[in-house]
């Protein structure tokens, strides 16, 4: 049994109002939270702070905070809350190191990430880990030849897949305009210089029936690039790894004389803050804590075919004839969505705040205000080495609602309102799902996104709104102010530094600086990028005083009453100097 140490310092001897609980990494976070509950329940304290001393707190299940924990503060002193497990017992096998993967909580595990000495290693893949000149190794991706929608077959050059023709668990990562799909390969059949690839279900049906985004072929534009991963046959460079789930072995090709501290993720979520509509979780603050080492296993189990911003399709198909929508253009497709897990997830909360935290080494998203969250600040936090979205807020259509339909819940408490994300630093997020976003806000009201610095990301910097629809919905009074965004769109286009969807009365996007877009050669349309982009249904939005190197903007199928005022290179230096993290 783990040793549990609690040192409780009480504010006064008789009627105590505050208490402090001090724990160490060999203590239980869950037990500390329970102790805080009991102090409050027994009337011994009204405010409790749990102090996490330095070190790594390995979890075997998510830490759950409920309405009974309202008023709690967690303070970290170089503390890491980890969903990982250390791998030890490495043995040399030629150029590789191999270790047994132990069970976790009594069962075998699988994972999609590995961190070695604090750095994400590369899951064995068909493109180089890096190139001597520092250029983008993904420039060496192969391109598809064509695809057969009816029979669910994708054709590729034989040279591209020759190594993995018989690999049992290989995956294709397919670049599709503004998304990437993860497709588990079922079969490879050679015919001359080409190979016909089929995929496992359920993603095979989704991949060939969803119309947007679709892969490009030589007949439709720049053919879609792809790379292969998760096959031992691809493990050929230092820094790469492969997990043999049949044999429960982990293979890693090390740097010369590299001494390993290796961690694999075993949890998908670290902290769940969950209340109810009548009894939300209130007034919780988490300070100075690092959240690390999660995975997200759905792509390994069911594939991953997203519509946009990493929101994955559960069903999708093309409409014939198209649907007439009053005040909107005709609709040619249907889609229902799910969302990836995040390291920290919130539902039915009020004033749950994060100050000076780090979200890093994560295989899903970072921080997600999912449903019915009121207020809540995220300040002076760092988001880095995240596979998917960094900060996420609001609904992206409930699972049962077709995603192009307007979302206007009868109970407005469902809507995330009044969040404030400021003075945060986002970089090297979206590093696995390239179609994800640093700050991704869907159906939100009164969100304030200001003075953040965002750079080195795969796609769009800030995405605000959802729905592809100009009908009046629950979005309003949002603010995007004085953010600095650069080196974005490193892998995907049809993007912008700041991007909007839908009708958002009272929304103002002002005094932001957007510059320095990346120029990958493999995007579907090399001209389809923008600094500012109001997409379908965007209405009642004010864009003013934003500095960009040129007026490369797009207004696509917008609704009424958008205002564009004083945006471009003429905006004053004082605005440029004030943008970003302070």
Where are these regions (language model features)?
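Sec-dependent N-terminal signal peptides
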Residues: 4-13
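Boundary at the C-terminal end of the N-terminal hydrophobic targeting segment
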Residues: 16-19
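Extracellular polysaccharide-degrading/modifying enzymes targeting complex plant/algal/animal polysaccharides
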Residues: 22-348, 353, 399-410
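The right-handed parallel beta-helix/beta-solenoid scaffold, focusing on the short coil/turn
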Residues: 46-48, 55, 61, 70-72, ...
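Extracellular beta-strand solenoid repeats
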Residues: 51, 58, 64, 73-75, ...
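Short glycine/acidic-rich loop motifs that flank beta-strands on beta-rich extracellular proteins
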Residues: 61-62, 268, 295-301, 341, ...
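Right-handed parallel beta-helix
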Residues: 282-293, 330, 350-361, 373-388, ...
